[in-house]
């Protein structure tokens, strides 16, 4: 059911009315924003519907919003939920686009210089560009971001100044359009039409916008006049719609006008001269020679091409900032009336504070030893005090808010009662000595009931070793930690929900906000090891992962009860009692959370994977519709194909035909076709067969 509010551009897809503590929390937050409160906190337990409350608040206020999450996994989850709540509005995703990133560094003790190395995820880069476009164009924009949003991107003034507006019947030559596109870092490519490219065919110019993955623009010109414009499918060429005007945005956040680049070159030369004098005066000739060689090369590249490798280190010169000025970030693109929601604030706020110092310590070595100019220090994330000055009206969201949030907040809205009636999980304490074997027996019980299990360890090595041990004993298990890239993390969580495996082992990523309703057991190993991973807040957050299941249970493996454990257990018991009282007073029977399993991020599966799934679905449907006689004929056909493949020495393909025949024969024998067990037979040798989950 779509709901709208007076004066708000948002259309809220609301399947149910706010219940429990939600209506009061929504009222408090909305009134707080309207009365001008700078900071508020939503203290909501796991499973109480905090995201639904925030969505209602945004819809009622009708203002653009940025939602910050502590990691990419939670950002993807929030993005998926917000898209479901606001299917007709601009919900965007802004996280780091690096799948792999090795920053530039120098180790003086070993005289070792490490070059910058990175791998950029094209799809996430497109989503980042789409996010800034929505902020510039629309009032109904909701940006879901990580702490990546406090790192420098292009100056919004330069970015906005480079935008190309094209209108029907406008007087503009093809040469001028090409020149503008080239300045916006679009590349001419007549053979491969991809994002951020354009091609020219006679009087027709095709542009593939960098922020779009599905639609391209065709501009037809006649005698230096735009005759018509159409949006078309870049793959099939099919026309989608005619448009009278269109705005083409730069292909990168880091575009700069030619005049700005030339001005920056002069200021870089001035800084270089001063730095070389410093090195010579201090008899650091190696550093001077190194700096001059590297910087002169970069200046030549900037002059000839408009960019160079490591151009971000000259961002202060390109944006015209003074030394020490904060860099332009995504927050500078926010409208004046925007809202900021910091999810899991007890983790996200300290993250923001820690980014600057870590970046600074690495770059100081590069500057001191002549690898970079001192201005490279200004290519940095925001300092915490700079971030605070830029914060619009802000809502902190957490089940365990820290002292910072509580002290800054004008008011705190509590959301402790769950509309579903679910109570906090039962907590059991067991000894450390038998923790692995005890946990394995508990896992087997849960797997038999088609329930999932989360296990937290203290180190990556422990997580991997435990995964190997469980796997050797026939348990379907995977691990999740920081070495796994963004897209794979999302796939792992999705596969856990789908039941492709039963146990997920992790360290610090199995805490804040992870929404897996199928999880009925959380096992916390070495719970009595006092520290960051076993603090009161960490324990409450980890235990909360089992709070979305009717049979939610937490097992703490400990030989002693620490102060953190005691406080976490007491708080959980307090919340259990409050929920039980609410259930009794309102005659509510607890019911589990049922959430549709969907892709968290569009495009996380590659085209080959998607094609494979389509092919498998077709095979499943075909086999399911066959009678016994048709199945027998299909087996004969596959046998011929198997022998033919063997004669051609395509043994992998022959083995897969053999497996398929065996599978069909077993189904023919018992007279049942189970679509989940039909596997695709690849058409080319060397491709892996589609295995059953758990193999």
UniProtKB/Swiss-Prot annotation:
Residues 632-667 form the UVR domain. It comes from the Bacteria. ATP binds at residues 44-51. GO terms for cellular component: cytoplasm; excinuclease repair complex. InterPro entries: Helicase/UvrB_N (IPR006935), Helicase_ATP-bd (IPR014001), Helicase_C-like (IPR001650), P-loop_NTPase (IPR027417), UVR_dom (IPR001943), UVR_dom_sf (IPR036876), UvrB (IPR004807), UvrB_inter (IPR041471). Residues 31-414 form the Helicase ATP-binding domain. The UvrABC repair system catalyzes the recognition and processing of DNA lesions. A damage recognition complex composed of 2 UvrA and 2 UvrB subunits scans DNA for abnormalities. Upon binding of the UvrA(2)B(2) complex to a putative damaged site, the DNA wraps around one UvrB monomer. DNA wrap is dependent on ATP binding by UvrB and probably causes local melting of the DNA helix, facilitating insertion of UvrB beta-hairpin between the DNA strands. Then UvrB probes one DNA strand for the presence of a lesion. Forms a heterotetramer with UvrA during the search for lesions. Interacts with UvrC in an incision complex. This is UvrABC system protein B.
